[in-house]
């Protein structure tokens, strides 16, 4: 089994203050890996560098065999991203948002399957503006998996989840891992 993510000597500073200082990390294909730590520990910075959305000051990063800083569309087609917050979709329904996002991928999952997987079947045709915080978070997870990615980045994915939603989320993560999906997530707990 190959490494999905390899990081060596990763460094990133903001205004002279190190957010990440010399991180080495290997995540195997199909592994579920969590970065655990308090606010300001560099978890989100590390994930954003691995996603290719933030530049690094030093170090080597390979994600699915590619340096994310120069990665193209075919590489991005292999990853799913769930950020800490999302916005701009309030006038759509979850079904519309997922269907729209699915169109940018070459092999997306079935939208109704994703809606069921994230527990939004009863809210699929409700405007997103009318969803609770936990329901919006479930939609964020759906948006991250609808492309059928090989690798999913989840930044604080269970924020706003009630206990049952959190259990359902971990069941979904186990199912994705059982299908061979690599998962990198950040969490405080």
PLM regions with names:
Residues 51:
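Helix-to-loop junction immediately C-terminal to a conserved catalytic motif
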Residues 59-70, 74-75:
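Conserved ABC transporter NBD signature motif
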Residues 99, 103, 108-124:
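Conserved ABC ATPase "signature" region
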Residues 141:
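Hydrophobic anchor residue at the start of the ABC signature
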Residues 152-155:
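Catalytic Walker B motif of ABC-type/P-loop ATPase nucleotide-binding domains
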Residues 166-179:
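Helical segment within the ABC ATPase nucleotide-binding domain
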């Amino acid at each position: 089994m190959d490494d999905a993510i390899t990081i060596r000597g990763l460094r990133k500073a903001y205004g002279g203050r190190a957010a990440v200082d010399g991180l080495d990390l290997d995540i195997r294909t199909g592994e579920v890996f969590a970065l655990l730590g308090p606010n300001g520990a560099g978890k989100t910075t590390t994930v954003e560098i691995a996603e290719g959305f933030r530049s690094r000051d030093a170090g080597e990063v390979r994600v699915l065999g590619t340096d994310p800083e120069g990665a193209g569309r075919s590489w991005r087609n292999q990853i799913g991203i769930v950020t800490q917050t999302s916005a701009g979709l309030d006038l759509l329904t979850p079904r519309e948002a997922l269907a729209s996002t699915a169109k940018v991928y070459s092999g997306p999952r079935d939208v109704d399957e994703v809606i069921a997987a994230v527990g939004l079947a009863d809210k699929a045709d409700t405007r997103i503006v009318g969803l609770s915080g936990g329901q919006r978070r479930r939609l964020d997870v759906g948006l991250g998996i609808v492309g059928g990615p090989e690798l999913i980045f989840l930044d604080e994915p269970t924020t706003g989840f009630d206990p049952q939603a959190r259990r359902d989320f971990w069941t979904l993560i186990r199912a994705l891992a059982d299908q061979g999906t690599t998962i990198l997530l950040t969490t405080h707990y």
